[in-house]
């Protein structure tokens, strides 16, 4: 009986296009799979992320291999989304592991860096515009303050599911009728004690409710693991390891959610 049920589930998955959402690493990378498409967001595939030129200003060590490395999926990636030009989102050494002509959807500032480093298929995204990534549709939204001019939020949908991702602060004007999942920050980070650059858990839970999302997935986790001189300017309150009362998923590298 168990074998029959398993076979039925497999057949259903083959008939229906199921979106799979995967935590790409132990920080803020994500992977989406649907049909023959594999989309990587802010991929980090190196042992250490470094601030450009002056690495001692900001750096972070990887604790384990990324999902794409573990499963030998780097060459299977069909599209890349880079949400910001900051070095913890745009890791050049990681991106150099992909083909130079892979489609990359990103900001104007990030595109300058990519073009300078010989990537030939860069698309600069704009708020309220839609882009086709194979079987996925990418729709771009403005990020919340203070990131509204430097990064972006987005939804990614296929024929059955839709997710929302904001890597810093959500624009409080955004709302949706129905999301399968939202990927948000839950570890509050402030610069100089008053400029909030990452949401805390209570704000994230309120946004999950406002966005009408079934699941809340934590991103940008464990900010205390980021080191360097700049971190002395930050005040951090971590919550990612204790998401009580939250319908959450994908807590460890490689964990996935079928939507």
Predicted regions and their residues:
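Pre-active-site segment of Zn-dependent metallo-hydrolases
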Residues: 37-81, 93-94, 170-177
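Active-site environment of divalent metal-dependent phosphoester hydrolases
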Residues: 26-28, 46-48, 85-90, 111-113, ...
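Active-site HxH/HxHxD metal-binding segment of metal-dependent hydrolases
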Residues: 50, 65-131
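Active-site neighborhood of phospho(di)ester-bond hydrolases with catalytic His/Asp-centered motifs
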Residues: 40-42, 77-88, 105-107, 163-169, ...
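Metallo-beta-lactamase
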Residues: 106-160, 248-259
